[in-house]
Amino acid sequence: MTLFLAGCRHDELVVPTEYDIINDVPDPDTSIRGFYLVNEGNMGSNKCTLDYFDYFTGLYARNFYAERNPNVIKELGDVGNDIGIYGSKLYVVVNCSHKVEVLDSRTGTRLGQVDIPNCRYVRFYRGKAYVSSYVGPVLIDPDAPKGAVYEVDTTSLKVTRKVSVGYQPEEMEIVDDYMYVANSGGYRVPNYDNTVSVIQMVDFKQVQQIPVGINLHRLKKDRYNKLWVTSRGDYQSRPSRMYVLDKRRGYNQMIVTDTLPFGVSNMVIRGDTLYFYSTEWNNYTQSNTITYGIVDVRTKQLVSNNFITDGTEKEITIPYGIAVHPETGDILVTDAKNYVSSGTLYCFDRLGRKKWSVRTGDIPAHITFLKRQGHE
């Protein structure tokens, strides 16, 4: 069932919010209220949108931002690249609009924005938000500048510090008062970057660059403070890989300890389990190879080639986002389909069986869970 709620704005048509009903009854004692999903929208279309699912009402809301902020011109902007909740605020990184939108995480109403050029991903630490940035324009350029990480005060929403890192930085994690940043160098093709920058948080300076692999992208930490880093390769002769970084006994510095011989497009870690999907494009064959796998982070071994166990992965055209419910273990996978029309969000139980699916905005990509009040 789909419900509609129309909105209005002077001299501009507001696309109405649509509601679908999903029967996914939560545990009454759960700490999770729901989740937000940001749809990237095709570059240049200004169609970044925000969806919200509430487990307790069963309502899935498409284009939630427009309903809650009818007077905001151009809505969220162009290409939503990341999303996260810290305290009472929801942060949406809007890459090609060069800003981070900040909303009330309970109501979805706009609180402000932080202007950051070509912003990519956001992480949080001790009252601050940290945003990776390509710094330069959205443009393939062999002379593209080095990127940076911006520090934002989460109370004032002002940029407080900035540090230069490698070329075209992507995801980040913080371990023991050090930030690790995956540098891609994607704008400087074929001269990709191959390093992880290390930032000492106390004085916010880059203190090291760790050689890992070319064209780095994803970077996640596990419960043992190991780092899992993905390389996209060069899409031709140098294949994508996943690397594990850990500290040698008696040393404080991270080093590459393991190389896993397969590609990873995106991943999420829950407990000792790393779920990933891989969409590997080959320029020679002009085709994708898609896999859904599980890695045991303790043994660093691939334990499954397909976490979807009922055959319904055949319904997915292009996996584009992944998340795991922190309590139930339900696995959420988004499908970008053809990149220019509505996508689909799939929910699988922890055993890999499809529970439900729902239509989303264009290019559904990034998910963050909202806790119930009193459970933050």
Regions found by a protein language model. Give the residues of each.
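Predominantly soluble domains enriched in secretory-pathway, periplasmic, or organellar proteins
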Residues: 9-376
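C-terminal motif of bacterial Sec signal peptides marking the signal peptidase cleavage site
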Residues: 4-7
